[in-house]
């Protein structure tokens, strides 16, 4: 958005964690992946404990130490504005500003639908907060953050979600028909409830709803793709189900879908809301994803299939009530912020 619409502004994208210490970045990324895959409850506990107390203090102290190395880069680049989409980056920059080492404006973009206090460390030195919805804005205000620097713009998404797609052409490419409901099923994640539950839920859709078309995206997960394809073959549904690997056509597929089945990550959720898609939530990792799931369920946008839920029962209820999906779609419109990226840029640069 910046490079396309604000030609006089120089932009540089930097992974501050890799810059500060690539070894720590690799260790923390690997640890998160292993916990999310094998012991998601452990990540959930770390997430909760890092709100306040000893763990939050340790995190804050380590970010102050790492900020010293980041200072070298910031002095070299001397930016007018720093935009951060991670709490650690925001903390490091606000600490340097507090110590009068930098004078840059700082904009923090919170990338989930529930607040976490790690985002707010050093808030008095942050100039802009961009949040997903008004309740988050009210939470920040309750933490004594000046409401004039909080904007409920939504989480930034690709401008491809602003395009008008020819739905008939997209359906035709898939050999689908426009007079049937289409479900977009993201099953490539390797975290959360894992492969077994995901495959069980996919099988429910295939067996329960023969008149529904399904676009199943397995991503880079070969085992998931194989499992999906096997079910499709067994149920003789090759005519109305497409099992795909990684795709760059998410905006197009969302434009022709009536429902999305997905993990509730901040970006995918924002894209679904921009596309006005009701959601079936699967596999949320304890922590921010579970908080996202709770928010979406409470706002009548999503059905959350939990670990011990009967997916057959949940999905039967979803499709047996003719008013439920239309009502969920109406609810998405209340939180849809498809111009989030453009509005953030206008606030920062106009």
Name what the model sees in each region.
Residues 4-76:
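Conserved N-terminal ligand/cofactor-binding loop architecture of enzyme catalytic domains
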Residues 74, 102, 118-128:
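A conserved, positively charged/aromatic
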Residues 127-190:
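A nucleotide-sugar donor-handling region in carbohydrate enzymes
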Residues 169, 176-256:
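Donor-nucleotide binding loops and adjacent catalytic segments primarily
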Residues 249-291:
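A donor-sugar binding/catalytic signature common to diverse glycosyltransferases
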Residues 297-300, 307-324:
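C-terminal "capping" alpha-helix adjacent to the active site of nucleotide-linked donor transferases
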Residues 324-338:
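A short, well-ordered alpha-helix in the C-terminal region of glycosyltransferases
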Residues 337-350:
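C-terminal alpha-helical cap of glycosyltransferases
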């Amino acid at each position: 958005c910046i490079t396309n619409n604000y030609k006089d502004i120089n932009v540089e994208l930097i992974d501050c964690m890799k810059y500060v210490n690539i070894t720590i970045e690799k260790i923390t990324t690997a640890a998160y992946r292993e916990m999310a895959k094998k012991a998601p409850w452990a990540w959930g506990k770390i997430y909760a404990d890092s709100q306040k107390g000893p763990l939050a203090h340790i995190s804050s102290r380590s970010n102050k130490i790492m900020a010293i190395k980041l200072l070298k880069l910031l002095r070299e680049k001397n930016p007018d504005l720093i935009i951060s989409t991670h709490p650690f980056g925001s903390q490091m920059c606000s600490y340097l500003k507090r110590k009068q080492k930098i004078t840059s404006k700082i904009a923090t973009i919170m990338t989930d639908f529930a607040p976490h206090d790690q985002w707010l460390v050093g808030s008095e030195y942050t100039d802009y907060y961009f949040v997903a919805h008004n309740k988050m804005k009210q939470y920040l205000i309750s933490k004594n953050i000046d409401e004039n620097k909080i904007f409920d713009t939504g989480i930034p998404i690709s401008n491809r979600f602003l395009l008008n797609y020819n739905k008939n052409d997209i359906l035709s490419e898939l050999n689908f028909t426009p007079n049937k409901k289409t479900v977009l099923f993201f099953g490539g994640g390797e975290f959360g409830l894992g492969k077994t539950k995901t495959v069980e839920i996919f099988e429910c859709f295939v067996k329960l709803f023969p008149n529904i078309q399904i676009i199943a995206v397995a991503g880079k997960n070969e085992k998931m793709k194989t499992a999906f394809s096997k079910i499709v073959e067994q149920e003789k549904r090759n005519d109305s189900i497409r099992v795909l690997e990684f795709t760059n056509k998410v905006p197009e597929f969302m434009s022709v879908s009536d429902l999305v089945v997905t993990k509730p990550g901040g970006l995918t959720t924002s894209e679904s809301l921009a596309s006005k898609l009701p959601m079936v939530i699967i596999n949320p990792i304890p922590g921010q994803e579970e908080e996202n799931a709770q928010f979406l369920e409470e706002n009548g946008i999503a059905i959350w299939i939990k670990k011990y839920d009967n997916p057959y029962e949940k999905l039967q209820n979803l499709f047996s009530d003719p008013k439920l999906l239309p009502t969920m779609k109406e609810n998405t419109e209340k939180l849809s912020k498809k111009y989030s990226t453009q509005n953030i840029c206008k606030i920062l640069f106009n």
